[in-house]
Amino acid sequence: MCRDFIASGYKYLESFEKDYIPIFTYKVNNITIKKLICMQYGKNTVCVLYKIDNPGKQAKFTITPIINFRDFHTMTTNWEFSLKQNIKNKKVKIEINDKPETPIYMCISAGNYIEHYNDVFRNMYYI
């Protein structure tokens, strides 16, 4: 069974911890997903690690990174930007609005990165 959890993932949040780093624990059916987030001090770097405990059948785990530019006081409306995606093995480089001096890098330990184009969230809000 595959559902669109992108906009409703918060409904599956079971717990939140913040000792040294934030840990979000989600429960979907019988699958437990822990998301650990760590930022490197003084750098524009973040690491997101997922730990999945699935004692049942095989499942598909899809991560959809959201790239968003907004003032932290406002809601994203209909602003669009261009993305250039470069994929080599398990490393992804994304350039936004043709600015190679500020790329986003992602490293994937398992699975595959799938390029997406024209995926836009309209009127995004945060709960």
Which stretches of residues belong to each language-model region?
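Acidic, mature catalytic/reactive cores of soluble proteins
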Residues: M1-I127
